[in-house]
Amino acid sequence: LYAGVGGFGFTAAQAGAGSVIGVETSDEAVAAGNAAAAQQGMGSVEFIAADATQWVREKPAPELIIVNPPRRGLGPDLPGWLNECSAERIIYSSCNPTTLARDLAAMDSWKVDQARLFDMFPQTPHMEVIALLSRI
């Protein structure tokens, strides 16, 4: 969810994920992701232009969900769906530790198993955090 041009999705596919669906609101990012998948011969990777919160309500949950939301975080509705869905794991990539903490507090059926902070923008206050979540 919030797939961008597919960096996490391609990595998951290369690691052996059976199928990967990337959901992104940007038509340009979806087109770029689908073009890259075709160019790399990754038929199991597909990108869809849709709102993440709306899309998840219409589809069955996968075993693993990767979310990479914008700085504003997951929004008010997606954490509730994540609490109720049947997914076994979540990888949460965040560019804003404050909204990550807020979203995790709203996801009370999940626990953080591992987390890493990445200082990808030295000399700035910006950082990336990756958290691996599992069911409580």
Locate predicted features.
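Rossmann-like S-adenosyl-L-methionine
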Residues: 1-136
